[in-house]
């Protein structure tokens, strides 16, 4: 089990992916209900399928989570994906070098098209707290439930009908 220490921000309008930056397409599905103390996620990226289990460390604040990841085969991935009941999302991820860190920029597809967020991971809580974001980072949304991928996946599924009701 490892600690994940990160901060999350929106991406400022007008920001462009730097030339030569590499990225990859990701698909994620969430198996645990919103607000659960333990989050279960499956992810497909390139040739890998990964199961992730995250717990939230209330004592350390919103920036710190315990995380376990392990590879699963295609058949298990497909079965778990179907169990997610539509709480899925698709996004393209770029890794943008910063001076001492890497900014992970996610641009969402489908119902979330146009939404972009950036995360930076750190080796310690002190390092995370002292980080000064570059100008192209927008509002900080670390710890905001509305900006969690789990909530975004559920909101992508909630398509309004003609009367404005979600189904």
Model-identified regions with their sequence ranges:
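Phosphate-end processing signature that detects enzymes handling 5′-triphosphorylated RNA
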Residues: 1-167
């Amino acid at each position: 089990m490892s600690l994940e220490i990160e901060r999350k921000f929106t991406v400022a309008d007008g920001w462009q992916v730097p030339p030569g930056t590499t990225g990859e397409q990701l698909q994620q599905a969430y198996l645990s209900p919103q607000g659960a103390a333990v989050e279960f996620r499956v992810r497909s990226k390139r040739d890998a399928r990964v199961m992730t289990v995250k717990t939230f460390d209330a004592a350390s604040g919103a920036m710190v989570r315990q995380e376990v990841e392990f590879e699963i085969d295609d058949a298990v991935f497909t079965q778990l994906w179907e169990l997610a009941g539509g709480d899925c999302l698709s996004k393209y991820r770029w890794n943008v070098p910063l001076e001492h860190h890497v900014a992970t920029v996610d641009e969402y597809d489908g119902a979330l098209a146009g939404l972009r967020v950036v995360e930076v991971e750190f080796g310690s809580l002190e390092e995370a707290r002292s980080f000064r974001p570059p100008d192209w980072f927008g509002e900080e949304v670390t710890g905001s439930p509305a900006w969690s991928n789990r909530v975004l996946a559920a909101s992508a599924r909630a398509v309004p009908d003609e009367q404005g009701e979600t189904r």
